[in-house]
Regions:
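Cell wall/extracellular polymer interaction/catalysis modules
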Residues: 2-159, 166-175, 180
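Low-complexity, Gly/Ser/Thr/Pro-rich intrinsically disordered linker/tail segments
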Residues: 182-187
C-alpha cells in the first residue's frame, strides 16, 4: 500500500490536493482515517460530504497516489434523510435513508431501473453493513443535475443510494469499480 501520500499527515495531504474551500479538512481527515483502518492509503477515495446541502457539488473523487482531485460533482441522498439537507441516516431496509461510513466499491452492474451502476459493500457494522441487502448502489439519475436544482431548489432524492449525474457513470465506473473506496460523511 505504499504511495506518494504515505507518511504525509492528513492536513499536508489535504493542502497538496488543494481541497481548501471545497471540502472541509476534518471531513477529509475522517475519510482518510477510515481508509487507513483497512491499511489503505493509496488508490481512489471518494468522499460524499452529506453535511453540505444537495445543491453543492459534495462528492469528491480523489487519487491519493497522484494527490489530485479527479471529480467534484453532485450526489443525492435518500428521501428519508431530508430534503435540501441530509439530516437522518439509517442502515435499515425500507428507511429510504442514506447510510454513512466507509464502503468498498464493488463490480459494475446493470440495474434494470438505473442502467450502469456500482455495487457498494458497507464496511462499518451497524452503520452501512446492510448496503448489499438494501441494494444501495452508485447509479445515475435524472434528478441529479443543475437543471433539477434550478427547477426544484434542491436535488431529487434516492431510496438511500448515492445517485449522481447520469453522464458521469462511465467515468465513475472507470475510477471506482472493483476496489475504490467511498466514505459517506454526515453529522
Amino acid at each position: 500500500f505504499a504511495s506518494a501520500s504515505a507518511g504525509l499527515s492528513a492536513n499536508v495531504l489535504y493542502a497538496e490536493i488543494g481541497l481548501q474551500g471545497q471540502l472541509g479538512e476534518q471531513v477529509f481527515a475522517a475519510g482518510l482515517r477510515s481508509a487507513e483502518r483497512l491499511g489503505q492509503r493509496s488508490g481512489i477515495l471518494a468522499i460524499a460530504d452529506m453535511t453540505q446541502p444537495s445543491t453543492a457539488k459534495r462528492l469528491f473523487v480523489i487519487d491519493l497516489d497522484s494527490k489530485m482531485l479527479l471529480v467534484r460533482t453532485y450526489v443525492a441522498h435518500g428521501q428519508g434523510s431530508g430534503d435540501l439537507h441530509c439530516t437522518a441516516f439509517s442502515n435499515r431496509e425500507g428507511s429510504h435513508q442514506t447510510s454513512k461510513g466507509l464502503y468498498r466499491v464493488g463490480s459494475e452492474i446493470v440495474s434494470p431501473k438505473h442502467g450502469p451502476a456500482l455495487l457498494l459493500h458497507g464496511l462499518d457494522k451497524g452503520l452501512n453493513d446492510q448496503a448489499l441487502a438494501r441494494e444501495v448502489i452508485i447509479h445515475g439519475a435524472d434528478y441529479v443535475s443543475p437543471t433539477f436544482i434550478a427547477q426544484h431548489g434542491r436535488l431529487g432524492r434516492s431510496w438511500g443510494c448515492p445517485a449522481v449525474e447520469r453522464q458521469l457513470m462511465p467515468q465513475l465506473i472507470d475510477l471506482l469499480a472493483d476496489g475504490g473506496l467511498l466514505y459517506v460523511h454526515g453529522r
